[in-house]
Every structure is written in C-alpha cells, then in structure tokens.
Curated annotation (Swiss-Prot):
<comment type="pathway">
    <text>Carbohydrate metabolism; tricarboxylic acid cycle; isocitrate from oxaloacetate: step 1/2.</text>
</comment>
<dbReference type="GO" id="GO:0005759">
    <property type="term" value="C:mitochondrial matrix"/>
</dbReference>
<dbReference type="InterPro" id="IPR036969">
    <property type="entry name" value="Citrate_synthase_sf"/>
</dbReference>
<dbReference type="GO" id="GO:0005975">
    <property type="term" value="P:carbohydrate metabolic process"/>
</dbReference>
<dbReference type="InterPro" id="IPR016142">
    <property type="entry name" value="Citrate_synth-like_lrg_a-sub"/>
</dbReference>
<feature type="compositionally biased region" description="Polar residues">
    <location>
        <begin position="488"/>
        <end position="501"/>
    </location>
</feature>
<feature type="active site">
    <location>
        <position position="288"/>
    </location>
</feature>
<feature type="region of interest" description="Disordered">
    <location>
        <begin position="483"/>
        <end position="512"/>
    </location>
</feature>
<keyword id="KW-0816">Tricarboxylic acid cycle</keyword>
<keyword id="KW-0963">Cytoplasm</keyword>
<dbReference type="InterPro" id="IPR002020">
    <property type="entry name" value="Citrate_synthase"/>
</dbReference>
<dbReference type="GO" id="GO:0005829">
    <property type="term" value="C:cytosol"/>
</dbReference>
<dbReference type="GO" id="GO:0004108">
    <property type="term" value="F:citrate (Si)-synthase activity"/>
</dbReference>
<feature type="active site">
    <location>
        <position position="383"/>
    </location>
</feature>
<protein>
    <recommendedName>
        <fullName>Citrate synthase</fullName>
        <ecNumber>2.3.3.16</ecNumber>
    </recommendedName>
</protein>
<dbReference type="GO" id="GO:0006099">
    <property type="term" value="P:tricarboxylic acid cycle"/>
</dbReference>
<comment type="similarity">
    <text>Belongs to the citrate synthase family.</text>
</comment>
Length: 512
C-alpha cells in the first residue's frame, strides 16, 4: 500500500517540460511543450474561443522576447556578462586571435588550421580590389555625401556586378553550391574595407588608394585610409592591433537589429549583397550604429570633470540621459566594454590622452558607486568606449557606423550561411493586430467631408527655396488670362514694384 502511495506521489510530482494554459473564456486547458526554455508561438493558434476563429497570437513589439531562429554562432548570458563566439570567450579571442581568424570561426564554426588560415587570408585579400565602374559610381556622389550612405549604395550596386550570385537570376538553389557561396563571402569581406576607405577619401577630397595585399586585413584598411604618396607606408602596429580588437568585438552579437534584418531579408533568398546593404541600412540608424556618437556628444556637453556630479543628479531627475550605460541584453558589465577600456589605455599611451577619456573615467567611477545606477543594473556598454577610441585615432564621427559595418559583415554572413542551411527556413512573415476601421463604403470625391483635425498635416512638408518662389509666383500671376490678382501681401502695383526693384526690369504677364 505504501509502495503504491509512493508511486502515486512520484507520478504527481513528476516534472513535465510543458506549459499548461487555461482559457478562461471557454474553460479549456491546453498543454504546450517547452524546449530550451521556449514555447512555439504557433502552438497558441490552437487556443480559440470559437472553432472558426484564427487563434491566439503572441504580441511582442520589437521582438523583445521572441526567438526567430536556432543558432550556434553567438552565446550571450546578459546576467553574468558572458559573450562567446562558437563557444570561445570574447576575452580570449580579442587577446589571442585576429579579425580574419574570428570571421572564419563565425562563418565555418571552428578555428582554422594553419593551412586553412593561410588560404582563407589569401582568398580574402585577393578580393580587395573593386570594379572600376563601382569606383566611378562612388566618385559621382556629392563631395559631402555621408560615408555610410556611400557604403550602403555600393553594397547594393555590387549585386549588379555578379548576376551569377543572384538567385533571382541564376536560380533559387544556387547556394547549394558551397564554392559559389564562399566566393561571395570572399568578395564581401575583401571589398568592404576598400569601399569604406574610398568613402572616407571621397569626403576629404583625396584620390582613392589601391589595396595592399601584402598587409593584414586591418593594416590594409588603415593603409588605404592614410597613405599619401609613399611607396612603403605602413600603419603603426599599435593602431592596427587596436582596430583588430575593435573589429573582433563588433563582429557579431546574436540577433541585434541589423543581424535580424539580415536574416529577414535573406529569408527571401535574395543575393547576399542586397541583404548586407539592408543590414547596413538598419545599422545606419542612430539607435543602433550611432550610439557611440551620442556618448561623445554627452561627454562634450559635460565639458569638465567638475560638472559630472551635477550631470548625474540631472540624470536621476530624468532631465538628462546617461548614454553608453545599460543594455537590452546585459544586466552586468558588458564584456566588450572591459576589453575596450584596456584598448583605450593602449591608444592613449601612443597618441596622448584625450580630455574626454578623463571625463568618461570619472563618470564611470561615480555612476558605479551610486546605488541609483547599481539598482537599475546600468553598467557601461560597448558604445561607452568605442567612440572615444575612434575619435582618439582620428576618425570623424560620420565614419563610426562604417567602422561598425565592416566587422559586423562577418556576423551577417555567418547568419546568412546558417540560415540557408536551416531545414526550418521559411520566409519571414510576422503577424499584426489590426486596429483600424472595417466595412467602409467608397465615397465619391465630391461627396467627401474633409477631416479638419488632420487635413493640414497629411501632406505638409518643409518648403524649399524653389517651393517658396513658386508659391509667391502662383499667387502673383494668373497664367490663363494674364491678370495679376490682388493678394494678401499687397496690391498688384506694390508687388510689381517690389519685383521690378529686385530684378531691375519691368514685369509683364508674358515674361514667364
């Protein structure tokens, strides 16, 4: 009897990897499987009030708590401040590896052997030159074109140079050919620094430099940025290594906005150039690729160390924002920020201290000793130091998102490769909750009533000088009968006299 009772107790307390949902509208109970701490949203479709209903959906603005793929690329534990690429701690990779080796790791899953590494480096560096027509296109941009706009446009244009790489032209199954896939990886990783360097040189009005394939990846990038006429120019090794570390820690970060964009666009089976251009477009946004620039503006606004206590009080009072602190994922110190803090000291030892760094260091010290920020788990993130480093290295702020895009392309391509190999791959198709009107009947234009509350806003825009001149002219002249009507600004004679005085000639209705 006791044995039977024990069995009953075991059955009662047996752990089940399921979630039980009770629909209080119907009283029905649903059991949903739990795997890897997740439930499938499609399982909730079975929960219906009536059999003809669509079913229950999960509402999650911004995908804040939604997993859209299974991945083996990057692991993050935000509570403990852990970041790993393919299981390797970011601290070890930043200290011991190189950007190209990390790129290989992200894309192919393992660290390369010496032979694989040599071949990989050679393949990438042999694809650093860009087509002369692409160079001509870049030279056609305005002198003050933003480098990120030039990079996005050039990436997109590259898809037209390689039609054999476009599934829309060459067939949806072309990337079952791994050699063809590898070719596009070599091209994108090889040519991105060249495009970025050309965009930078374009802004400062200097001729573009050809790549030097005898140099390392980041060394070659700095060479293309800074070489003047020297035949043997070589960037300083401290700067090269610092940039390599920056590239390593920016190479991937799980499903951030731009990487999620890569997966969404790539789910259509579009070519990787178009997908990378879309991802770079997402990174261009100030909430993604522009956060480190916002940190610099904050530090410059603080001005001196003496102003920091006042600034911190204003942050607590919600009068100021503390940029570079806190993260959507990390609830402890961002491991990338720890690495960059060391890199910052290396750069300053070579180039001299930046006054902003002194402000940043004191701001961090005071914030991390204040219970207000500790209780809210606000710690420095990667953007807090990256902008200071880039500025100290002499990069203008409009190059910051470009410097983010070059290394992040390795992560984008890793996710592209993984996604195309996923047997569960389907085109992304999020759902919406429709909140608008229904069952409206079409009303002829003459019978419609103007909605006064927004009639002036729907088509409003800033007026250019062209618009203002046209508006005044259309008020002044009646082109149909040649009459010049009175306007709110004055009579015909007053307006005519004003215009005649400005242009020094008589105005007639036919002079237009």
């Amino acid at each position: 009897m006791s044995s039977n009772s024990q069995e009953d107790n075991n059955k009662t307390t047996e752990k089940k990897n399921t979630l039980t949902v009770i629909d209080n509208r119907t009283g029905k109970s649903y059991e949903i499987p739990i795997n890897h701490e997740t439930v499938k949203s499609i399982d909730f479709r079975a929960i219906k009030e009536q059999s003809i209903d669509f079913g229950t959906m999960i509402y999650d603005p911004g995908y804040y708590n939604t997993a859209v793929c299974k991945s083996q690329i990057t692991y993050i534990d935000g509570d403990r401040g852990i970041l790993e690429y393919r299981g390797y701690p970011i601290e070890q990779l930043a200290e011991k590896s190189s950007f190209l080796e990390v790129s290989y790791l992200l894309i192919y899953g393992d660290l390369p052997s010496k032979e694989q590494s040599n071949l990989w480096n050679t393949k990438i560096m042999n694809h650093t030159f860009i087509h002369e027509n692409l160079i001509s296109m870049m030279k056609s941009f305005r002198y003050d074109a933003h480098p990120m706009g030039m990079l996005i446009s050039s990436l997109s244009a590259m898809s037209t140079f390689y039609p054999e790489a476009n599934p829309a032209l060459a067939g949806v199954d072309i990337y079952k050919n791994k050699q063809l896939m590898n070719k596009q990886i070599f091209r994108i990783l090889g040519k991105l620094p060249t495009i970025a360097a050309c965009a930078y040189r374009h802004r400062i009005g200097r001729p573009y430099n050809d790549p030097s394939n005898t140099l390392s990846y980041t060394e070659n990038f700095l060479y293309m940025l800074d070489r003047l006429s020297e035949s043997n120019y070589k960037p300083h090794p401290v700067l090269t290594r610092a940039l390599d570390k920056l590239f390593i820690i920016h190479a991937d970060h799980e499903l951030n906005c731009s990487t999620a964009t890569m997966r969404q666009i790539a789910s259509t089976l579009v070519d990787p150039y178009t997908a990378c251009a879309g991802s770079a477009g997402a990174l261009y946004g100030p909430l993604h690729g522009g956060a480190n620039e916002a940190v610099l503006r904050m530090l410059e606004a603080i001005g001196t160390i003496e102003n920091i206590p006042k600034f911190i009080e204003q942050v607590k009072q919600k009068k100021q924002r503390l940029m570079g602190f806190g993260h959507r994922v990390y609830k402890s110190y961002d491991p990338r920020a720890k690495i960059l803090k060391t890199v910052t000291m290396e750069i300053f030892a070579l180039l001299g201290k930046n006054p902003l760094m002194q402000i940043a260091t004191e701001l961090e010290r005071l914030a991390l000793s204040d219970s207000y920020f500790i209780e809210r788990q606000l710690y420095p993130n990667v953007d807090f130091y990256s902008g200071i480093i880039y500025k100290s290295m002499g990069f203008p702020t409009d190059m910051f998102p470009v410097l983010f895009s070059i290394p992040r392309a390795a992560g984008w391509l890793a996710h592209w490769v993984e996604e195309l190999a996923d047997p569960e791959l389907r085109i992304f198709r999020p759902r919406q909750i429709y909140m608008g009107r229904r069952n409206m009947n079409y009303v002829p234009m003459d019978a419609r009533q103007v909605q006064q509350h927004n009639s002036g806003e729907k088509l409003s825009s800033f007026s250019s000088g062209f618009d203002r001149r046209r508006d005044v002219s259309e008020e002044l002249f009646n082109f149909e009968d040649g009459a010049i009507p009175k306007t709110a600004t004055g009579s015909k004679s007053q307006l005519s006299a004003s215009i005649e005085q400005s242009f020094g000639e008589k105005i007639s209705p036919q002079s237009h």
